[in-house]
UniProtKB/Swiss-Prot annotation:
GO BP terms, alphabetized: mRNA catabolic process
Subcellular location: Cell membrane
Protein name: Ribonuclease Y
Membrane-spanning segments: 3-23
Domain of life: Bacteria
EC number: 3.1.-.-
Organism: Clostridium perfringens (strain 13 / Type A)
Pfam family, one: HD
NCBIfam families listed in its UniProt record: HDIG, RNase_Y
Matches recorded under InterPro entries: HD/PDEase_dom, HD_domain, HDIG_dom, KH_dom, KH_dom_type_1, KH_dom_type_1_sf, Ribonuclease_Y, RNase_Y_N
GO cellular component, one term: plasma membrane
Location of the KH domain: 201-286
Designated gene of the protein: rny
Keyword Chaperone among record annotations: no
Domain HD residues, every copy: 327-420
Length: 511
């Protein structure tokens, strides 16, 4: 057993030696191989480095050659440019030399002419002195006296010629102005087609049958009295078949009465309470119509941006007349005419139209305003923020204030043209209406008066007083005072009945 172990150990030793010998040999071969490869790599690197060095040297030589060539070219260009500049300098120097010679020659010529001119001036002065002395000797006048006479004569001739020229120009200007104004006014009138004429103070309401007349009158006339009292309108019921005539100088009252009566006829129930209700509705309808008419007028004339109160005043002009002419239609017509004339003259068309439309708004206010309607209209326009030009045109269209713009003159001319149109106005009707207005103005001037209506063509005035401010004795005294004031201030045919009405109502409700 020991022998076997020894043999194994020996075998292992032999095998280990063989392996060691083989490993050593392999390592030696590997080292030699690596050394050989390293030597080859080093030689290859040396060859590549040598090649790169040669290429770099060649590139550097080429770059140096290129830079030298560029420098030579730039040097040649600079040399050529310097040569061209030198040639130009030489040419300019030669040109300056020639100009200098020419200037010297011209200076010599000028000096010679100056000497000649000086000699001529001396000769002229000598001749002038000799002639003046000769003239003074012949005329026995000094030079100052002769100059004064000559200037006076020239002055007289110029003044005469100027006066003749001014007169001729003024005549031509007037002729041209008259001709141009006629053309402008004719053109404006032709382009403005107005179809409205004067209005009357009555309105006819159609009835379905004659039996309706009795219902309108009512028992013992209470219905017709109530309607007349509430509206201030005369109801004329005569033999005219199927018709009732409403008579009042105030178109607003007449319109309220017409609407209320037509509503009552359609409704069929006619008694004092129903009449009061229908009159209140009619008043609201008329107020709405006033607003719509004002807006329609601004739309027709192209005038925008008006204050709502101004529009309301415009609408009220529908129910105002001037010598029988509807004031709203008249204002629209004036707006058109003023705008057309402004366009012909190259003025502000919008300003002329606006002022023309608003020129009579002073007629739309109630009796609490005093003064000419033009001045009142100007104050209202200023109050509602209209421009100063519009305010002046309104206030000045009847000459109450001085006109400050040409558009104001056009508004005045358009107002006159519209009023002078055939069929537009009636003088007698206006005088009649003014008398009725004066009657109502006198009545309402007393404290405690609520409403007053001039009826029966001015032969009667009904005055409603406030019962809490005027008692029965006060009503009698007021009637006497009004009679006295009317007799002092008005001229009228016949007599006028003063009817002061004091009414007290007590209303309560059963529940």
């Amino acid at each position: 057993m020991v022998v076997g172990i020894l043999i194994g150990i020996i075998i292992l030793g032999v095998v280990g030696f063989i392996q060691y010998t083989l490993i050593q040999k392999a390592s030696k071969n590997r080292v030699e191989s690596l050394e050989k490869e390293a030597s080859l790599t080093l030689e290859e690197a040396k060859r590549e480095a040598e090649s790169t060095k040669k290429e770099a040297i060649l590139e550097a030589k080429e770059e140096v050659h290129k830079l030298r060539a560029d420098l030579d070219k730039e040097t040649r260009d600079r040399r050529n440019e310097i040569q061209r500049f030198e040639r130009r300098l030489i040419q300019r120097e030669e040109s300056l030399d020639k100009k200098g010679e020419m200037l010297e020659k011209r200076e010599d010529s000028i000096n010679k002419k100056s000497i000649e001119i000086q000699e001529l001036e001396e000769r002229v002065q000598n001749l002038y002195g000799e002639q003046r002395a000769e003239l003074e000797r012949i005329s026995n006048l000094s030079s100052e006296d002769a100059r004064t006479l000559l200037l006076d004569e020239v002055r007289r001739e110029i003044k005469h010629e100027s006066a003749m020229l001014i007169k001729e120009l003024e005549t031509k200007a007037k002729e041209e102005a008259d001709k141009k104004s006629r053309e402008i006014i004719t053109t404006a009138i032709q382009r403005c087609a107005a179809d409205h004429v004067s209005e009357t103070t009555v309105h006819v309401v159609a009835l379905p049958n004659d039996e309706m007349k009795g219902r309108i009158i009512g028992r013992e006339g209470r219905n017709i009295r109530t309607l007349e009292t509430l509206t201030g309108v005369d109801l004329i019921i005569d033999d005219t078949p199927e018709a009732v005539i409403l008579s009042s100088f105030d178109p607003i009252r007449r319109e309220v009465a017409r609407i209320a009566l037509e509503k009552l006829i359609v409704d069929g129930r006619i008694h004092p309470a129903r009449i009061e209700e229908m009159v209140e509705r009619a008043i609201k309808d008329v107020e709405n119509d006033i607003k719509e008419e004002g807006e329609q007028a601004t739309f027709e004339t192209g005038v925008h941006g008006l204050h709502p109160e101004i529009i309301k005043l415009l609408g009220r002009l529908k129910y105002r007349t001037s010598y029988g002419q509807n004031v709203l239609k008249h204002s629209i017509e004036v707006s058109y005419l003023a705008g057309l004339m402004a366009s012909e003259l190259g003025l502000d068309v919008n300003l002329a139209r606006r002022a023309g439309l608003l020129h009579d708004i002073g007629k739309g206010v109630d009796q609490e305003y005093e003064g000419p309607h033009a001045v009142i209209g100007g104050e209202l326009a200023k109050k509602y923020h209209e421009s100063p030009a519009v305010v002046n045109a309104i206030a000045a269209h009847h000459g109450d204030t001085e006109m400050q713009t040409l558009e104001a003159v056009l508004v005045q001319a358009a107002d006159a043209i519209s009023a002078a149109r055939p069929g537009a106005r009636r003088e007698t009707l206006e005088a009649y209406i003014k008398r009725l207005e004066k009657l109502e103005e006198i009545a309402t001037s007393y404290e405690g008066v609520e409403k007053s209506y001039a009826i029966q063509a001015g032969r009667e005035i009904r005055i409603m007083v406030k019962p809490d401010q005027v008692d029965d004795a006060g009503a009698i005294e007021m009637a006497r005072n009004i009679v006295k004031k009317i007799e002092e201030q008005l001229e009228y045919p016949g007599q006028i009945k003063i009817n002061v009405i004091r009414e007290t109502r007590a209303v309560d409700y059963a529940k």
